[in-house]
Amino acid sequence: MSRYGLQKLYINGAYTDSASGDTFDAVNPANGECIAQLQAANAQDVDKAVAAAKQGQPVWAAMTAMERSRILRRAVDILRDRNDELAAIETADTGKPLSETRSVDIVTGADVLEYYAGLIPALEGQQIPLRGSAFVYTRREPLGVVAGIGAWNYPIQIALWKSAPALAAGNAMIFKPSEVTSLTALKLAEIYTEAGLPAGVFNVLTGSGDQVGQMLTEHPGIAKVSFTGGIASGKKVMANAAGSTLKDVTMELGGKSPLIIFADADLDKAADIAMMANFYSSGQVCTNGTRVFVPQALQAAFEQKIVERVKRIHIGDPSDERTNFGPLVSFQHRDSVMRYIDSGKREGATLLIGGYSLTEDALAHGAYVAPTVFTHCRDDMQIVREEIFGPVMSILSYQSEEEVIRRANDTEYGLAAGVVTQDLNRAHRVIHQLQAGICWINTWGESAPEMPVGGYKHSGVGRENGISTLEHYTQIKSIQVELGSFNSVF
């Protein structure tokens, strides 16, 4: 028997057997152990979830703003009370270090839910005077039933990022977690029910993106899809959504983000920022600053500081709280990252450190790849052009501000960017020219609930978090009122 046993679908406020009974395994990437069997949804299950959501959504939307706010705040309290339990599940399912999941994943997800719970009473329309006898007022009404499709790197955090604004605005959600990391989304559904969310307002369907995800994006009963994943999948989501019922779409599709270090930067601080921008979560973060631009005159000194820091990384069992670097999410993904590393070697980049999978002792049973740093990289190399989503840093040298801005923008992505400098005039001047939706000055990676998150170019459509996202889960109804007479031309 696996550690977490058989996991059913969550529909209409309860665990429910799938129509087919087909299952797939959840695997701990630290040791290859099967930790759960998950039921795979099919078209019947999708229809059932949509029907439940359609029934529950009007009940939820009819509650007062304060009632909805109180229920979501109760969910926040339960999340925080169960933080350690959820962190342990997340670590087993993703391979992320417990030191990380315990302090970040559930904590930041709960913060987002609390933020939107507080905004619910502030969601209001406008009154617009026209003339003495007439005015217009607007209402912000929920879209109805919406779908969220998550990625595998931050399972419960992404589920909360998507569900919090949707529920706050009065919608019902059907959430499909990544088939690689599904367990905590099911726990979140339990928590919402325990907090008092009406049945059918939050449902979880597990299964593959090619099947369940496509069914959701094409379903005529769903008004909006919020998707996190890769560009190729995002294009399919947009095409399916437009080809079915012209659904509203929000997408975050990853990046190949530049981190620019200027000559006046504190080099120790710059190295620390570059480490966090490349090796946190074993490099499996969509906003990673994997293209690190360094002035040619500082390159050797910077590289020395990076190598020193990489050697201090504590790689090991993610359930050991001393570990700060765990395995990649799956063996398949490990192999993909290794192919990129091999490509970097073939194309002539200089390997400073790492560049291999870890196979000594207990690590041999897991999907571990050593933190890897390449230097003397060129802009046309595969490791510089494509999103690797792993612990691979590329160091590139430059000569001038104008040059580095041009090269930083030379990518199809536009998710994130950052600069490290003591000259704030330069910092703002450069940031304003970088084609990226999320930018950091002298820091990297933090995204507070108040901060809209999303990308330019191929990195996405729309934003998550912040006030504007709440509004995007509503539709505006305009009503004109005439208090005086009405004159017809007929």
From Swiss-Prot:
Cofactor(s) the record lists: K(+)
Binding residues for K(+) 2: 246, 457, 460
Xref: SUPFAM superfamilies: ALDH-like
Cofactor remark from the record: Binds 2 potassium ions per subunit.
Modified residues (Cysteine sulfenic acid (-SOH)): 286
Gene3D superfamilies: Aldehyde Dehydrogenase, Chain A, domain 1, Aldehyde Dehydrogenase, Chain A, domain 2
Active site, renumbered: 162 (charge relay system), 252 (proton acceptor), 286 (nucleophile), 464 (charge relay system)
Function description: Involved in the biosynthesis of the osmoprotectant glycine betaine. Catalyzes the irreversible oxidation of betaine aldehyde to the corresponding acid.
Name assigned to this protein: Betaine aldehyde dehydrogenase
Species classification: Bacteria, Pseudomonadati, Pseudomonadota, Gammaproteobacteria, Enterobacterales
